[in-house]
């Protein structure tokens, strides 16, 4: 039986509340609508069945309450946030409140005029994502024949408007062997920051894990090449910064996910559900909604946000582990996805009794034969089919 510990009588009583910090980082998932179909999207599988999006006024109320509580950084995400017609207005209101604002976008739907409007509204930062350095592979993964050309044009336009060029490439077994070409493209575009983020397995990426997880050999090679480029760029005095993010499937200790559950990070989904991380929606927990509760109540008093705070909730082997203050027991969403119980130790940890699942995934990556065309693409049709079971 799947469990987060939230549906049993024993779980109704929480341990004493640990000290709670401020929700410094607010992620506003403005919409699940998106013109692309990336098979590694972190959105929930049943996104097509989610409720009505928050209105402009409701989002502004969220921003105001979060800012009053100490939130400092606000990310606009999705889906594709550009499909919201009120995006410039939301950026402007966030600016008035004093947020540092970041637009996380595919670049599809972006125009020179919108960049100008966002600049006037006070947007601080734009990150554009690519699927690959090769036009054919990029467009195949995105599910759009025009995606690559649009991304190139908008990356240059963002820089021309005075923004630093920040690019994100999600890497996986189908594009990681071209890491050198990806970096060369970024250099040619005069990128300032490049995130080479190996696929993290949540949402659609978890559904497609066997077809996306790189082999260890692929990862080692990609990281070596990235380090070689770093050294070369530094020697040349080049300002481009390369950030290489590995999947924890090849680690022996889990990541300190979100710096701890309900520690500094707060996500609000398109329908107003508030989450301690953007992957938590899959858990069978009744998370609070901003339509019904204040941000103050959600952050400090709601069951969902307090469930895995601190250390008292931990079973063994986490409870007695001398590393628990470093990794907080790892990722609760990953523990739930793989074991059915979010209170279990993250299976990535070699101390977890479920670590064999990770070892099996590594073995499967060595023999996987999935093509890009065989992946389940993130679109409304597939989402509705999944929701129906």
UniProtKB/Swiss-Prot annotation:
Catalysis: reaction(s): [PQQ precursor protein] + S-adenosyl-L-methionine = E-Y cross-linked-[PQQ precursor protein] + 5'-deoxyadenosine + L-methionine + H(+)
Pfam annotation, one family: Fer4_12
Pathway stated in the Swiss-Prot or TrEMBL entry: Cofactor biosynthesis; pyrroloquinoline quinone biosynthesis
Cofactor: record remark: Binds 1 [4Fe-4S] cluster. The cluster is coordinated with 3 cysteines and an exchangeable S-adenosyl-L-methionine.
Sites where the protein binds [4Fe-4S] cluster: 34, 38, 41
Keywords (A to Z) from UniProt: 4Fe-4S, Iron, Iron-sulfur, Metal-binding, Oxidoreductase, PQQ biosynthesis, S-adenosyl-L-methionine
Keyword Ribonucleoprotein on entry: no
A single GO BP: pyrroloquinoline quinone biosynthetic process
Cofactor(s) this protein requires: [4Fe-4S] cluster
EC number: 1.21.98.4
This protein's record includes keyword Chaperone: no
InterPro entries xrefs: 4Fe4S-binding_SPASM_dom, Aldolase_TIM, Elp3/MiaA/NifB-like_rSAM, MoaA_NifB_PqqE_Fe-S-bd_CS, PQQ_synth_PqqE_bac, PqqE-like, Radical_SAM_PqqE_MftC-like, rSAM
Intrachain S-S bonds: none
Superkingdom in the source lineage: Bacteria
Enzyme class, first EC level, given as a word: oxidoreductase
Family annotation (PROSITE patterns): MOAA_NIFB_PQQE, RADICAL_SAM
Domain Radical SAM core: start-end pairs: 20-235
A Gene Ontology molecular function term of the record: oxidoreductase activity
Cited SUPFAM superfamilies: Radical SAM enzymes
Oligomer and partners: Interacts with PqqD. The interaction is necessary for activity of PqqE.
Record-linked HAMAP family: PqqE (MF_00660)
Biological function: Catalyzes the cross-linking of a glutamate residue and a tyrosine residue in the PqqA protein as part of the biosynthesis of pyrroloquinoline quinone (PQQ).
Family designation: Belongs to the radical SAM superfamily. PqqE family.
Protein name: PqqA peptide cyclase
Organism: Pseudomonas fluorescens (strain ATCC BAA-477 / NRRL B-23932 / Pf-5)
Gene name per UniProt: pqqE
């Amino acid at each position: 039986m799947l469990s987060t510990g939230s549906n049993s009588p024993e779980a109704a009583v929480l341990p004493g509340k640990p000290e709670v910090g401020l929700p410094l980082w607010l992620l506003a998932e403005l919409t699940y609508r998106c013109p692309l179909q990336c098979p590694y999207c972190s959105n929930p599988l049943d996104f097509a069945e989610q409720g009505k999006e928050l209105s402009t006024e409701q989002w502004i109320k969220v921003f105001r309450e979060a800012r009053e509580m100490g939130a400092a950084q606000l990310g606009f995400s999705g889906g594709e946030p550009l499909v919201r017609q009120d995006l410039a207005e939301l950026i402007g209101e966030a600016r008035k409140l004093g947020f540092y604002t970041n637009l996380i976008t595919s670049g599809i739907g972006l125009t020179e005029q919108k960049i100008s409007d966002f600049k006037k509204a006070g947007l601080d930062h734009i990150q554009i994502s690519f699927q690959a350095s090769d036009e054919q592979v990029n467009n195949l993964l995105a599910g759009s024949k025009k995606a690559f050309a649009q991304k190139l044009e908008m990356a240059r336009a963002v820089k021309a408007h005075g923004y630093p060029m920040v690019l994100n490439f999600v890497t996986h077994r189908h594009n990681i062997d071209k890491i050198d070409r990806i970096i060369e493209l970024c250099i040619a575009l005069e990128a300032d920051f490049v995130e080479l983020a190996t696929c993290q397995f949540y949402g659609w990426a978890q559904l497609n894990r066997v077809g996306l997880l790189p082999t260890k050999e692929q990862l080692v090679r990609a990281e070596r090449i990235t380090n070689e480029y770093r050294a070369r760029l530094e020697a040349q005095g080049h300002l481009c910064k390369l950030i290489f993010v590995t999947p924890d499937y090849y680690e022996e200790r889990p990541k300190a996910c979100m710096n701890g559950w309900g520690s500094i990070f707060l996500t609000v989904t398109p329908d107003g559900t508030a989450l301690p991380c953007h992957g938590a929606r899959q858990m069978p927990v009744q998370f609070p909604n901003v339509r019904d509760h204040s941000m103050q109540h959600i952050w400090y008093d709601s069951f969902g946000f307090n469930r895995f705070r601190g250390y008292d909730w931990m079973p063994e082997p986490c409870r007695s582990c001398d590393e628990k203050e470093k990794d907080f027991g790892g990722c609760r969403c990953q523990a739930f996805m793989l074991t059915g119980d979010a209170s279990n130790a993250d299976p990535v940890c070699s101390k977890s009794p479920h670590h064999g699942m990770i070892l099996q995934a590594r073995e499967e990556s060595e023999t996987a034969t999935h093509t890009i065309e065989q992946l389940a693409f993130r679109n409304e049709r597939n989402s509705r089919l999944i929701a129906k079971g």
